[in-house]
Amino acid sequence: LPCPVLANGNVYSAQKAAEVLKSTGACGLMIGRGAIRNPWLFRQIREHQRGEAVFVPRGTDVLIYVRALYEAVCSPAARESAQVQKLKKYLNYLGVGVDPAGQFLHQVRRITTAAELFRVCDKFLNHDRPMPLEPFPLALKEGDLMAGEQW
């Protein structure tokens, strides 16, 4: 095409970014959910493009990010329950890479207070193990709905 084209959709890792650029011939990427889930993604893409080792965040890195995100998006004037609900929207993107069984998201979705939120985050993220660069596949059960279709 005579104009630059950007690719978009499900770019969660530097490897996936490279694959999308190669397979589409696009001149760049638009990244949304992947950057919410992994705020180091742009750094990782640059490292991958330069042939360097890609930074892999540890659980503690993600825990620090969650705390910073809470401070950034929550207004002190808002009710605590509203602040928690707001952060839970972001944690839906992040949570798909925390544990393959989905227990983190299961617990997060039932939280109503900031204390509960940080207790669950500490339980799942207060460790030095590397976090997966790609989200875990969704484990759909019979009766679940996905994009309007029942499984």
Q: Which residue stretches match the model-derived regions?
A:
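Alpha/beta catalytic cores of nucleotide-metabolism and tRNA/nucleoside-modifying enzymes
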Residues: 1-7, 11-151
